[in-house]
Each structure stands twice: as structure tokens, then as C-alpha cells.
Amino acid sequence: MAEVNVRNFNINFGPQHPAAHGVLRMVLELDGEVVERVDPHIGLLHRGTEKLMETKTYLQAGPYLDRLDYVAPMNQEHAFVLAIEKLLNIKVPKRGQLIRVLFSEIGRILNHLLNVTTQAMDVGALTPPLWGFEQRERLMIFYERACGARLHANYFRPGGVHQDLPESLVEDIGNFIDPFLVSLEKLDALVTPNRIFKQRNVDIGIVSIDEAWARSFSGVMIRGAGVPWDLRKSQPYECYDEMEFDIPIGKNSDCYDRYLIRMEEMRQSAKIMRQCVERLLGAEKNGPVSSLDRKIVPPKRSEMKSSMEALIHHFKLYTEGFHTPPGEVYVAVEAPKGEFGVYLVSDGTNKPYRVKLRAPGFAHLQAMDFLTRGHMLADATAILGSIDIVFGEVDR
């Protein structure tokens, strides 16, 4: 019998694939149905964000951060303003810190709702996204009421936040929490015990602790491997050290564990939100939301109508911006997808000399080859769904 040359089969996954999460293109090398190699092609959404930020003042560079992980925009802004505040050595008033923490946790819920429901959709369940997006819509309205924009907020500013929250909004956020937890339990009851969902996710995409550290995993990916590493606890920033919450960790480090962690993190985020709301309506009901340093934070409109100095400060801030002392800082926050870091180099002018953005999804996507090798073709979508990729931050 003649010898037959059996060669592997190459297939393109994306960039228009419904499960490709944006503009991802993966070249898969298959041996029958088994994945031998995965080659992610990135760069289809590259906009040169880091270079653009070097041509803008610090205040003008803020909105670029919203356009990275556009599922939870305020979490990215948080890292950038913390880096500027570290350079300038300024303190944010407690009420401003609480508002930031509140909206960071809203962002975490926005992200995890999208991820767990689309992860279920990737493996064939169509109901969860409809349920999840109903709650996301309510949270988007809170974004809109705080700053006027549903998505690209530009709400966190160096020194604090853009404007104070009306009391009615804080009350409405407090009233949102309990109904949200009820709907989360319904979603949990629908998806978690589902036989098909379990078969598609249990023991898929397993990663050991050593491998997770070596591949610079962070966020849910490292906690799924059983490491209680969360920057809100291990390197607390803002007022997270005053908040009570738990860090869920995984046992088997597979796709199912990562799903369960995200579900539990939403409950913990709701717990933090409740604490913020109680303090914003109680002990911290009044007080400034931004630093009172007029060289960094613009004055109120009412001041500008009666004070020449306020008008000058306002004009200088929005034309020239503020100057930072020369130096370099790295600040990381626990974004919903993992450790989002901003490395900022200042040369003493009103623009950053260099901005490096450390996106968690970038490191996770690099591990696609390692995670998927030896699995079936259908498992590639389950793994991709569980590592939570958004291309805005991967390509920057």
C-alpha cells in the first residue's frame, strides 16, 4: 500500500468570527479535530494610544484610557490618575476616594456580566446574555447620570473626580444592589449546574500555579490557579484597605473555575458598593470630591464668576495644563481583567515623556497556544471566552 503523506490542516479563526471577541485572528493548526498550534494575530485595532498620549497634556490624555478596555472604562482611568497623583504627591479627599471605588466596582460588575454571559453564549447558551445585559443597562445609566456618558466617561480626574454625585444617584445605586443579587442568583441557577455548560468547561484550559506565574497571569487567571493575589488586598490603593470583602480562588484552574470566580467576584463587588453607598450617605455625606489645589483641579464655575484668580487658573489648566516634577512611576490597579498598570515617565513638562500601558489581556492572549494545545477545536472558543479578551487594551 502506498504511503500517504498526512499533513496538518490550517484554519483561520476570525477576524469576523462571532466568538472571536472583536478583531482577533487566530491561525489554528489542526490534526483532525485536535489543536496542535495556535498563532494569535494581533494589531488589527492598533491606534497608537501610547504615542498619542505623549502629544497631549495630562488632562487631555485621560479620555484615551476609556478606549482601551471599553467594557469597564473607569478602571483604566483609575490607574492613570493614580500615577499622576503619585508624581504630584497629592491626596484625594475621602469622599472622592469612595466615589472612585464605587465606580470601579460598578465597572467590575459590567465586565464580569459581559464575560460570563458571552462565555455561556460561546458554548451555545442564548438566554444568559439577555439576562445579563438587562443589569448592565441599569449600571450604564448610573455611569450616564454621574458624568453624562454611557461608555467613555472621562470621570476620574487627577486629584479626584470630575463632579460630585447627587444624593438621589447614590440612593439609587444602593437600591440597585439587592435586586441585582437576586437576578445574579437566577443566572447562577440557570448556568452553573447546566450539564452542557459543565461538559464544555470543566477540565478545559488547565494551568498550573508555576505556569501562571511564569506567563505573568493576573486577575481571575492567577486566582483561578489557586493564588489569592488581588491588588486591592495585596497592594491596597484608595480606601480598599477599609473595605470588607473576600477573594475567591479556584481549585482546578480550568475554565469552569474562572467562571465561578467571576460570579463570586460580582457578589463581592456588590458588597463593596454597599459599603461605599452607606458611607457616602452617612459619614462622608459632605466634603470635597477633589483636591483643593487649584494648580491641578479646575475651580468651580461659581468661583470663576466672581474671582479673577479662579478664571486664570481655569484658563491655564485647560490650555497649558499642569507641569509634573521629573521622575518615573508605575501604578497598577486590579482591573476586572487583571493587573492594569501605567508606567509614566515625566520630564518636568506639561506632557508625559513616555506612557507605557500594561494590559492584562495581552499576557493572557499570549498563552492561548499553551492553553489550547492538545484540546479539541470546539474547546478553543471556551478557552478564549474564559480568558476574557477585549481588543482595545490588547492592541492599544
Curated annotation (Swiss-Prot):
First-tier enzyme category under EC: translocase
Gene Ontology CC: one annotated term: plasma membrane
GO terms for MF: NAD binding; NADH:ubiquinone reductase (non-electrogenic) activity; quinone binding
EC number: 7.1.1.-
InterPro entries linked: NADH_Q_OxRdtase_suD (IPR001135), NADH_UbQ_OxRdtase_49kDa_CS (IPR014029), NDH1_su_D/H (IPR022885), NiFe-Hase_large (IPR029014)
Membrane topology: Peripheral membrane protein
Keyword entries, A-Z: Cell inner membrane, Cell membrane, Membrane, NAD, Quinone, Translocase, Transport, Ubiquinone
UniProt keyword Ion transport present: no
Pfam families on file: Complex1_49kDa
Compartments it resides in: Cell inner membrane
Bridged cysteine pairs (disulfide): none
NCBIfam families from the UniProt entry: NuoD, PRK06075.1
Function in brief: NDH-1 shuttles electrons from NADH, via FMN and iron-sulfur (Fe-S) centers, to quinones in the respiratory chain. The immediate electron acceptor for the enzyme in this species is believed to be ubiquinone. Couples the redox reaction to proton translocation (for every two electrons transferred, four hydrogen ions are translocated across the cytoplasmic membrane), and thus conserves the redox energy in a proton gradient.
Protein name: NADH-quinone oxidoreductase subunit D
UniProt lineage: Bacteria, Pseudomonadati, Pseudomonadota, Alphaproteobacteria, Hyphomicrobiales
